[in-house]
Each structure stands twice: as structure tokens, then as C-alpha cells.
Amino acid sequence: VTYARARLLVGITGVGIWVVAAVAFLAADGPSVLPGPDATFSDQAAALAAVLGVYVLVSLPFDALGGYILPRRFGRSCPDRDAYVLGWARGVLVQAIAMALAVLAVVAAGRAGGTGAAIAVVAAIAMLIGVARMPIARMVADLGPSRVDPAHAGVVLVDATDPGFTGGVAGLGGRVMMPSSWTQALGQDLEVEVARRRAVAGAPYWLGLLLAAAWTVGGVAIAIALPGGGVQSVGQVAAVGAWFTLWSFLGLLVLPSVSRPGVMAADAAAAVAYPADRVAAVIRVLDGLQDDEPERPDVVEVVFHPIPSADRRIARLDPPCPGLRPWHAARMALPMSWCMLGLLGRAVHCNAGRPELWVLLPAD
């Protein structure tokens, strides 16, 4: 079993357990056990803390496998045990606080202005998470200093310990971010990856961001209307969270097919400015820093991977360049799911147990 397939198994199992748990919770009428609209604030807060505590405990073995055990088993870069535990605890605490504040804000809006107001708050939180992923990622994980790359105007280099950290595009202005380690890994070819990121930093980035937000808000709106759903209490919101987790699972199956063309479009844009062999070399180097899986079976890629395999990307470098495509929508939607108790945001194969990747998931 390769490192990539071992991680995939962890992700499939973790996601599967949360999907089964959500179905069981709804089928057993679990929301009725939690405080309803007439409960006091202290009862609501205690119930919310209990829900989040269960989330942390059930996630723990998959976090340990994905973030510590598998990297060490396969000789990947990994902090020592104490450093990992401290980093994991910090990430879990920040995520739990963020999810709790989001739930309380939605319930407050729902009580004050009804369902419409609650959905508006959900939309605001989802967009805030989307555009503020870099500062949120810094709160979740102990990312090192950032600095502007003197050789590439507008590019921010970020120190990170996880080799899976890729930076991305974030912020209102579509700021391009990359791990500082890539300056050594790519050398002069870093300019090729800079060209790729700049190609998606405008309309493709915003199209992907808005698509992720629309998927998130639409899913929450549907979940509120389903049995047990509502925005007046923690019990109702827990039901919404369970339904929304099932919606997020559907997103894991649907959104990668929307995201893959965006990767191909960025590759093709870089191949217009640079020789195809240089673009191919960058793709291979960066794939090696990730899961080192240059080739995948079609069914594995279609179902589980929003970023095509290195071999598939290289085979599609020839012009013509595709038109406008949304970029990174599948993986931008995952941290947005924090806005309504989405349980899959850090359970997928690429970021399970890796706090540096919980908000800024691996990008192409």
C-alpha cells in the first residue's frame, strides 16, 4: 500500500463514519434529546459544547492516523509527538470555537429575524471564511512568518512545516501565496508556478469562491427545511448540521468534477507562457511533495480527487487553452462548512490530522 492509498483509506473511513453517524442521529431522532427553543442559554451552550466534544473525540483516531502515524510509517516529514499533539490541540480548539460562535450567531439571528436572517448570517460567515482563509489558517496552525517574494511581485511566501502545504489564492484581492520551501524545490521554475497561480487569481478564483459559498449556503437552506431542522435552538441546528453533513458528502462527489477543469485551465495558461516541458517538470516536482501519486485509476480520480493526477495534467498541456473555469471550489467549500456544524471539513484524505491544511487545503 502506498502512502497516497493509505491516506485515501483513512479519508474514506473517516468520512464514511461521519455520514453513517449523521444518518443514525437523524433516524434515531437525536435532535429531540438536545435543548429546544425554550431552553436557557446555559443549557444551549452546554449542549453545543457536548456536540463539539463528540466531534473531537470521534475525529481523534483519524487525526492521529492522518497527521502522525502514517507520515512516520512512510518516512514523511512529521513533527515529534509532543509538537504534533500541541499543534493538533491548538487547531481543534480554534475550530471548535469558530464553529460554536457560528452556531450561536445563526441561532441569535434565527430568533431575532427568522430563517431568512439566519441564512443571511450563514452566507456572511461562509464568505468571511472564504476570503479570510489565510488569517484563519494562522489561528488554526502555527504557520511561520510570511514575506513578499522579492523576485515575484505580489507573491507571498509562507513558512510551513507540513510538506503538503501549498498556499493558494486568498483574500479580497486574490493574493497569491506559496510555501517558502518551493523556492528551493523549484529553483528557477518557481516562476512557472507563479504564472499558474496568477492565471487563477482573478476571475477563476472568485468564480470558485462564489460557487463554494453558493453550495454551502444552498445546502444549509435545504437542511433547515428538512425534518428536525430549524434555527431556534441547538437541537434544531444539530439536525441541520447532520443534514448538511450529508449535503457536504454529496459535494465531495460532485464538486471535484467542477474543480478539475480549473486545474487544467491553469496548466494550459502556464504552457502558453512557458515551454510545456518546464510546466510538466513543475507538476511532477510538486506531485512528489504531496502524495507522490503521478498516476491513478480513473474511478479513484473521478470520485476522490479534485486535482487530476500529474500524468493526466501533463497529457492535457497542449493548446487550445480552456476558457474560464472555477478554481479550487471543492476544497474551498470544506472550511466553509464550519459555518453550520459540517463534520467533513477536516476528515478528507488530504488534510486528516494536518492542522496546517484544515483551512488552506492542498491546491494545484
What kind of region is each of these model predictions?
Residues 1-231, 254-342, 356-364:
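Polar-ligand-bearing catalytic/cofactor-coordination segments
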Residues 222-241, 247:
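Flexible internal linker/loop segments at domain or repeat junctions
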Residues 241, 245-257:
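Hydrophobic alpha-helical transmembrane segments of polytopic membrane proteins
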Residues 352-353:
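Blade-level signature of beta-propeller repeat domains, shared across WD40, Kelch, NHL, RCC1
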